[in-house]
UniProtKB/Swiss-Prot annotation:
Keywords: ATP-binding, GTP-binding, Nucleotide-binding. NCBIfam families: PRK05416.1. Belongs to the RapZ-like family. It holds the Pfam family RapZ-like_N. This is Nucleotide-binding protein XOO1280. It comes from Xanthomonas oryzae pv. oryzae (strain KACC10331 / KXO85). GO terms for molecular function: ATP binding; GTP binding.
Length: 282
């Protein structure tokens, strides 16, 4: 996976999302070093078992036109290199820079921000024209953006059903795109334990606390029975992924724990594409 685009459009968020899904990621890699990087990662490992994501943009200060030649050569070795190009409107980019107070990568040229954005569009045009997908992030918040990366690109091809286990806080609303929704507020709440309150459902302390609760074990068993029965029936559906969402009060402990627990179970059952997304944490 090659991640490129305009500075401020979300490339770093995309790479972090791929990293969370067990991709080996490298950012700001010069194009001329890409072949050696890929070879080093594939050495001694089957191509099908390697998931790489590389960030390439104007910071690399290399000849971006070389990328098309490398992608053609990579196909001969059975390497699929999908190029994603992220962009946003000038207005959205200027607002993001104002909010974060970061400097544009081309500011060293003595350009004002609008001129730097225009210049970057020109420099990255060789990448944009060969992109497999162009994603405009102007109107997306970070949660919508991460979800789109996960569901459309990171989970794999559309010829097999992928599972996305999500956690959320009810006070912020139920995810509209969820196919299954389970209420974890019926479970004991680690929030009331002062030592567990600052942790999340991914931390060992919270996991141990909930693992030892009889109601949690019963709740988990019943959900496993339901999902194991009905998820396989969806394999013949036209959809490419299914979202299973767990909600609790704050989206921090119980819902995160259940999403992670069910994702582990799905992987143990042999589902090839499984991801987690914690809306209030990621």
């Amino acid at each position: 996976m090659i991640v490129s685009g305009l500075s401020g459009s979300g490339k770093s968020v995309a790479l972090k999302t791929f990293e969370d899904l067990d991709y080996y990621c490298s950012d700001n890699l010069p194009v001329e070093l890409l072949p050696d990087f890929v070879k080093s990662r594939l050495r001694g490992n089957p191509i099908g078992n390697q998931r790489l994501a590389v960030g390439i943009d104007v910071r690399s200060r290399s000849d971006l036109t070389q990328l098309a030649q490398w992608r053609l050569a990579a196909q001969e070795y059975g390497i699929e290199a999908l190029l994603l190009f992220f962009e946003a409107s000038d207005e959205a980019l200027i607002k993001r820079y104002a909010d974060t107070r970061r400097r544009h990568p081309l500011s060293h040229l003595g350009l004002a921000l609008p001129e730097a954005i225009t210049r970057e569009r020109q420099l990255t045009e060789p990448l944009r024209v060969q992109a497999d997908a162009i994603i405009d992030t102007s109107t997306l918040n970070v949660h919508q953006f991460r979800r789109r990366v996960v569901t459309e690109f990171a989970l794999g091809s559309n010829d097999r059903l992928s599972l996305l286990f999500e956690s959320f806080a009810y006070k912020r609303g139920v995810p509209a795109e969820a196919d299954f929704v389970f209420d974890a507020r019926v479970l004991p709440n680690p929030h009331w334990d002062p030592e567990l309150r600052p942790l999340t459902g991914r931390d060992a302390g919270v996991r141990n606390y909930l693992d030892n609760e009889a109601d949690v074990r019963r709740y988990s068993t019943q959900i496993v029975d339901l999902l194991d029965t009905w998820l396989p029936r969806l394999r013949n559906d036209t959809r490419s992924y299914v979202t299973i969402a767990f909600g609790c009060t704050g989206g921090k402990h119980r819902s995160v724990y259940m999403a992670e627990r069910m994702a582990r179970h799905a992987r143990e059952q042999g589902w090839p594409e499984v991801a987690t997304f914690h809306r209030e944490q990621d």
